Structure formats: C-alpha cells, structure tokens
Amino acid sequence: MTQQTMTPETKITEHFTYRELTNSATGRRLGLENKPNEQELGNIKKTAERLEKIRAWLGKKYGREVSIHVLSCFRSAAVNGAVGGSKTSAHRFGSAADIDAAGISNLQLARDIIQMRDDGEITFDQLIYEFPERGESGWVHFGCRHNSAERNQILTATKRGNGGKTQYLFGLHP
C-alpha cells in the first residue's frame, strides 16, 4: 500500500478507510491538502490496527458490533496549523485518532480502553478524555508511539476555570 495507490475508499484495515483516517473538514473548507507521506501512511495503518483491536474488544464486551467513528486522525502540517494543533501533535504524524463509539459514552469508552491496557490487550501513549464540561465529552483522543516507549498517560482536557484555555488534568475527570 503506497500513497500513489490510495483512493478515498481504500481500506487501510477491515473497518477503516483512507478517507476517514485523512478526513479534515477544516482542510476542505480552507482548500488545504491533507495527504500523508509514506512514513505517515505507515503510522496511520498502525494506528488503525489498534483501533481495530479496540473495536473487537468492545464487540466482545457488549455482545454486539460496536462501530468506532474517527473524528480526526492524520493532519498535514498545514491542516494542523489551521486547527491550532501543537507542532508535536501525534495527529501530525498519523499516530493519533480522536474517536467515539456507537452506543457508548465517551467516558465509558475511555474507561474501556484503560481496562484493555490494564488487561495487556493494548498500549497507548496518551488517552485524553476531551472536554466533559460540555455535557458529553466531544471525543476520546487515542495517541500512539509506534517507534518509541509509550507513556500510558491518562488525561482530561478541560476549559473549566482557566479563562477559556485548554488545560490537561491527570486522570479521568467526568
């Protein structure tokens, strides 16, 4: 699988397509290219493989197929800058996905991924429960390091009481 052979409908893994792993509404709106290079494409594939593990584990736990919706995975440098992302964001390199899961709250999704880690089923660099003060968290950030040690950080991103700036708290804070 190479960048030259990719079409929007190309399956990166069984349940995740090139389109959904490189989708960017901001990029489309601003006319920015959001195409990964070969190394980034390799990272996207590895990230999608971990998402498949999460999907399968959730299916077993809940006794039904559980779809994972990818809100954001890869971001080119231009797209990452346009959304105000950190220059070192794992999204920039295809090593993170902002996700939610059908029929499961984002808090429960985060707890389930932590349980998978505790059971030795998956590893991660960062798991971030994003913005729970909005009622239901907007998403769960699942970040990976494919070529170095992972920190297994569990964080909550919030704008509570910080003048509207995002702050990161260790642990899950519903």
Which ranges hold each PLM region?
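Active-site acidic/histidine clusters and adjacent loop/turn architecture
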Residues: 2-67
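Catalytic cores and adjacent binding grooves of peptidoglycan-active enzymes
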Residues: 101-174
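Short connector loops at helix/strand junctions that flank enzyme active sites
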Residues: 63-65, 92-96
